[in-house]
């Protein structure tokens, strides 16, 4: 059985660890990065099946990192889900315009996370 790899790019340690814990609980392998630049490098080398990315990070924003990933043949096809605590529609529009597949509002429940994973990894089925 294939185990999907999910990259979590989040500068807030508590938030990143919570995301990683929930994703592992759902049966996925997790790769973590604590800023956008490191996240882009890990995406290029690890080739994850899906990326969760914070929109606001100090060294490189989620928007800029998404643009970088969309410019690479290695990562342009990987679903990117932007995560934000900001509910304003302008952030959703900016994320989708730069190439993200979806936007989720933090905090995220386990069920919401599962729904997003099912939506963007269509070959996936979960028994929960």
Q: Residue ranges of each PLM-predicted region?
A:
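The feature encodes the CheY-like receiver
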Residues: 16, 58-61, 76, 88, ...
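Charged docking surfaces used in two-component/phosphorelay signaling
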Residues: 17-25
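Alpha4 helix (beta4-alpha4-beta5 surface) of REC/receiver domains from two-component response regulators
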Residues: 20, 64, 87-104, 112-115, ...
């Amino acid at each position: 059985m294939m185990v999907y790899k999910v990259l979590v790019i989040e500068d807030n340690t508590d938030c990143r660890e919570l995301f990683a814990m929930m994703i592992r609980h759902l049966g996925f392998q997790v790769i973590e990065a604590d800023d956008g630049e490191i996240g882009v490098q890990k995406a290029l080398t690890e080739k994850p099946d899906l990326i969760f990315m914070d929109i606001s990070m100090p060294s490189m924003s989620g928007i800029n990192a998404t643009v970088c990933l969309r410019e690479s043949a290695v990562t342009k096809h990987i679903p990117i889900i932007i995560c934000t605590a900001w509910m304003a529609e302008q952030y959703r529009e900016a994320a989708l315009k730069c190439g993200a597949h979806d936007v989720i509002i933090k905090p995220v429940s386990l069920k919401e996370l599962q729904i997003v994973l099912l939506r963007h990894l269509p070959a996936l089925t979960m028994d929960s």
